[in-house]
Amino acid sequence: MIKIAKEKRTFATKFKQMLMKETLKSYFGYDSFRPLQEEIIRHLLNKQDSLVLMPTGGGKSICYQLPALLSEGTAIVVSPLISLMKDQVETLQANGIAAGALNSSNDETENANLRRACIEGRLKLLYISPEKLIAEKDYLLRDMSISLFAIDEAHCISQWGHDFRPEYRRIRPIINEIGKAPLIALTATATPKVQHDIQKNLGMVDAQIFKSSFNRPNLYYEVRPKTANIDRDIIKFIRNNPEKSGIIYCLSRKKVEELAEILQANGINARAYHAGMDSATRTQNQDDFLMEKIDVIVATIAFGMGIDKPDVRYVIHYDIPKSLEGYYQETGRAGRDGGEGRCITFYTNKDLQKLEKFMQGKPVAEQEIGKQLLLETAAYAESSVCRRKTLLHYFGEEYLEDNCGNCDNCLNP
C-alpha cells in the first residue's frame, strides 16, 4: 500500500513537472527554466508563500505568471506603475494569455468589462495598483476566485527602499480580509534591512526565501569626476559608442530636457522622458527607444521600471543617485542579454549638498533615512575598493575575488 502511494506521488510530481515545462514552452517560448524559477513555481503551486530576491533580467515575472496559468481562478498582481502593468499585459496578451490591468488610465467601460471577466473567471492575471486594490477590496475582490497574490517591486513597502509607497503597507490587511491564497513578493533590489521590512509588513516571516546572486559579471562600473565639461564628456562617450542603445539618468526634469536638446543639437538621436511630460509624448518616446528608432533616452528615474529592452549597452548617471539600491536597479538595465553593459556615474560633492536641500521640509525620520542612504552612495563613489565587492556587500552578499577585472578601481588601481 505504501509503495502504491509513493508511486502515485512520484507520478503526480513528474506530471506536474511535464505540465510546467509544456506551459513554459507553449506560452513563453522557453525550452528550460532559469535558475530558481522551477523551484519557486513548484512552491507557489503547493500554496506556500515565497519571497523572491532576483536581479533585473533574472526572470521574476514567470515565477507567478506560469503558476497563474496552472491554477484555478485569477492571479492578482499588485504593481506600482501603470506603464509597468501596460507592458506586462501587452506581452501576456501577445502570448495568448487572458490578462488585464485595472487602473485609472482605463475608461469606466474598460474597467467594468475587466471586472465582469474576473467574476466570470475568464481572466488568468489581473494587474492592479495598490491604490486600486484598496478601492476594490469590498467589491470585486470578494466576488471573484483568486488563485494567488503577487506583489511586484516589493521593496516599495519599505521606508529603507528607494521607492517607498505607503499604500503598499495596506496590502497585507486586505489579503487577510479577502481570504487565503498563496502570496509571492518579488524585488530586484533588497538589502537585508529592506528584506526584513518586506517580510514584516507583508506578514511573510515564515515564507521561503529564494535569493539568486546579485552579481552581474558583464557590467562594467565606473565613477568619473563631474566637471564643467560633463556635457562634452557624455557627447564624446556616445560618439565613441555609435548606434548603441543607452539611458542617461538626471535628477531633475529640467536637466533631462536641457541635456536631450544638447545631444540633439550635436547630432545624437536622443529623446527626453519624465513624469511631467504629456502621456502621449512620453509613451511615444519610450516606444521609439524600445523599437530602436532612437539610440538614447535621457530620463528621470520614472523611466525604466519593468522596461524590457535586453540590449541597452550603457547607463550613465548625470547626477549621483539617491541610494545604492536605486543605483543598482538603474545600472541593472544595461546588458540584460548578457552582452556588454557600461555603467558610468559622474560624481561631485556638490550633488550631495543639492540632494540634502531637496530633503528639507520632509518629516525628520524620512530626512534621516534619506541622509543615510545618500552617505552610503557617496562612500561608494569615493571608495578605491572594487565597485562590485562594495555593491554586493551592500546587498548582504560576499564577493571573494580581490579583483573583478570589470570596474575602474580594479582596472586602474
Regions found by a protein language model. Give the residues of each.
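Short, intrinsically disordered low-complexity segments
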Residues: 7-8, 154, 281, 387
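Conserved Rossmann-like nucleotide-cofactor binding loop
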Residues: 83
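Helicase motor core with emphasis on the C-terminal RecA-like subdomain
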Residues: 15-27, 31-35, 39-61, 69-71, ...
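Short, positively charged and aromatic/hydrophobic N-terminal segments
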Residues: 1-6, 10, 14-16
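C-terminal accessory/connector segments of nucleic-acid motor ATPases
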Residues: 355, 359-413
